[in-house]
Structure formats: C-alpha cells, structure tokens
Amino acid sequence: MAQAGTTDLTPSIRWILAGLSLSMLLSSIGTSIANVSLPTLAQAFDASFQQVQWVVIAYLVTITTVIVSVGRLGDMTGRRRLLLVGVFLFTVASVLCGVAPTLWLLIAARAAQGLGAAIMMALTMAFVGETVPKSQVGSAMGLLGTMSAIGTALGPSLGGMLISEFSWR
C-alpha cells in the first residue's frame, strides 16, 4: 500500500529503472575491473607496470573529461538515441578489450569503453528525472547510487575471477 503523498511505480517505469540500473552497474564495474589484471597484462604483453597502468587510466580519464558535456549533447541529439549509442560503444569496446592483440589497442579500447560509460552514466541520471514521478526521484537516484557503489566494489572481485578462470582475455 502506498503512503499518502507517494506514487507507486508502474510496471513500465520499473522496467525502465531496471535497465537504467543495469547501465549504471556495468559502467561502474568498468572503473575497477581491470585493476587486478595489471600484473597479468604486464606479463602477457611483456610491458612495464607503468605502461599497463594506462589500461585503467585511459578509462578513467575519458570518463572524467567527457561526462560533463554528455548531458548537453543528449539535449541536442536526443537522450534515448545517445544512450543507445553509449551502450553500443561500451559493448563493442568491451569485445575489443577481450580480443586486443597489443597493449596499445587494449588501451584504445578502454578509452572507447570509457566514452561509452560516460554516456551511460550521465544519461542514466538524466532519464530518472524525466521518467520517474517527482515523488520517487530521490529513491530512484538512491538506487542508481547503490548500483554504482556495487559495481565499483564488485569490479576487482569479478576481474580477479575472470583472470583466474579464463585468463585476461
């Protein structure tokens, strides 16, 4: 039963919120999943630790430099279209990360993945404001914040599991 002054979320809004939560989770996992793989990558590519650190740095620098302008770009081109582009870019870049034959291609793929993640993070938050009833925006933002924290915390464990079970690819 809904409390006075609140609105229940319709099933379609719940599905939208689930999709937005997944978008936030995936982009947040990307921030920390590669950290534990750096020693393995240094060995696989016969590279120094300073060189393989760029796998993490490329992702984070791209997110931090692009995320602010994504909101305005979404206003100009359409948020839904741009979010789908971000998800597509993130997915393709993730595949490229898995098959990269050189360290430099892996770094470039991580930068592209960071671009997709920046789009996903920024527009996920924007969609909450236009999709969820005003009385539920705080709860929805809390859910997205929780998904971001879970993704960031889950990244190293997931990365370690993937490295130990399947190698870095």
Locate each region found by the language model.
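Transmembrane-helix bundle of Major Facilitator Superfamily
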Residues: 2-169
